[in-house]
């Protein structure tokens, strides 16, 4: 299974908009490739994430769970990238300070 971060972003946009056209506008891509990518994601996962009709899109139970997990994954990736950047710039790190008493008793 090879799920790309962009697939998670695409799914989140469709899940939040509940409309492929609006999600495509939000993502600045055309609607047909967005639909294809969501179908590919569903095939990779092996579960239907969205219930589609001619006029609407609804999340399935699997889709609701996947939405929560996808949001958490993207947040983790963003936080990891931010921490790595701060460490690289010296803004974050770990300092250990030790103390030994050598005063006579």
PLM features: residue spans?
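Short secondary-structure boundary/capping segments
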Residues: 2, 49, 86-88
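Alpha-helical linker/hinge and terminal dimerization helices associated
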Residues: 44-45, 66-88
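N-terminal winged-helix
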Residues: 31-32, 36, 82-105
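N-terminal short secondary-structure element
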Residues: 1-37, 51, 57, 66
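A short LG(V/I)-centered, amphipathic sequence patch enriched
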Residues: 42-59
């Amino acid at each position: 299974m090879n799920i790309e971060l962009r697939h998670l972003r695409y799914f989140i946009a469709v899940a939040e908009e509940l409309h492929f056209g609006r999600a495509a506008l939000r993502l600045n891509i055309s609607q047909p490739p967005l639909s294809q990518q969501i179908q590919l994601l569903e095939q990779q996962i092996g579960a239907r994430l969205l219930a589609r009709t001619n006029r609407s899109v609804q999340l399935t139970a699997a889709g609701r769970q996947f939405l929560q997990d996808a949001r958490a994954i993207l947040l983790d990736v963003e936080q990891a990238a931010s921490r790595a950047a701060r460490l690289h710039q010296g803004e974050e790190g770990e300092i250990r300070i030790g103390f030994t008493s050598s005063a006579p008793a």
